[in-house]
Amino acid sequence: MNERIKIGVIGVGHLGQTHARLLKQVKTADLVGVYDVDRTKAENIAAELGVKAFGSVDELAQSTEAVSIVAPTSVHYELAARLMKEGRHCFIEKPVTASVKEAEEICAIADRENVKVQVGHIERFNPAVLALSHLKLEPMFVECHRLAQFKPRGIDVAVVLDLMVHDIDLILNFIKSSVTSIDASGVGVISDTVDIANARIKFANGAVANLTSSRISQHPMRKMRMFQRDGYISIDFAEGIAEVYRATKPELGVPSGLNLGTIGIGDAARVVTYEQPEAPQVNSLKMELELFLQSVLADTPTVVSAHEALKVMVVADSIVKQIEESKKLLSL
């Protein structure tokens, strides 16, 4: 078995260049080249890394076993479908596609062609999220704020697909229950699509998630707060820090962390503790690329599969459609 996978990058804008530079550092990757419709961009990064600037997608495909697709969302499906049918494993940046129908087709092709697909939901690999891996997470109420300053990149899709998908993916991963209802609102301020959105998602087990995403905010914020029966968990994605507060019955023993004292009396007494679990010092993007290549080499499932990404798209699509319907009603 080869110990390195021949891989190429399609789309070398800001993020695509980062993919290429990191793949050059990954031991299991043999970065053979890049392709971009902007020939100058491709040649510049290729020269920097000492790889080839391919003249077409077909030329790149013929020289690779796997491809990292970092092109605009609108062409994800076209590129991935074409490459998978040629037997190429695909890492696809989020969102997986521009529509649910396209995402369904990606899943079908991947299964039929027996190729690996991993989708770039990078917050799964945020140090703060990794720091919580030892905890049993059963959140019943989740509050998310993902606010960013305006940048012209990514405005071809609504903020729901650009930013909110990160939180949708995490919530579906944390709350092991089916979605029962979604209530959403949003508005376009600068772009022709939705720039700020809020969604309230209810689950069959009674859990509720409230998500707000904006790409027109003055002060950036990427935070999630989760409340469950025995405690409260706060995640600061930007700082890579997780904080855990627990309220435990004294007879069950005091969990690790700083003891903040006891609240309540009698049967209602609870010991309150605080912990800031150690977060691993990792490059999240490099880690997800390494895991993708590991799944190709070992023929194991990818950590964020096309089927998981499809579930995210179904929720995101419902949110976008609700917002569009409310806009139609307002225009009557």
What spans do the regions from the language model cover?
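C-terminal helix-rich "cap/oligomerization" subdomain common to oxidoreductases
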Residues: 1, 66-69, 291-332
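N-terminal Rossmann-like dinucleotide-binding module
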Residues: 1-49, 171
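Beta-loop-alpha module in the N-terminal Rossmann-like domain of NAD(P)-dependent dehydrogenases
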Residues: 19, 49-107
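A short helix->loop->beta-strand "cap" motif at the edges of active sites that frequently abuts
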Residues: 51, 86-88, 113-116, 207
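A contiguous active-site-proximal alpha/beta segment in oxidoreductase catalytic domains
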Residues: 97-154
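Mid-domain beta-loop-alpha active-site segment that forms a flexible
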Residues: 120-127, 150-181, 194-195
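Contiguous beta-strand/loop segments that form the cofactor/metal-binding neighborhood of enzyme cores
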Residues: 168-247, 279-300
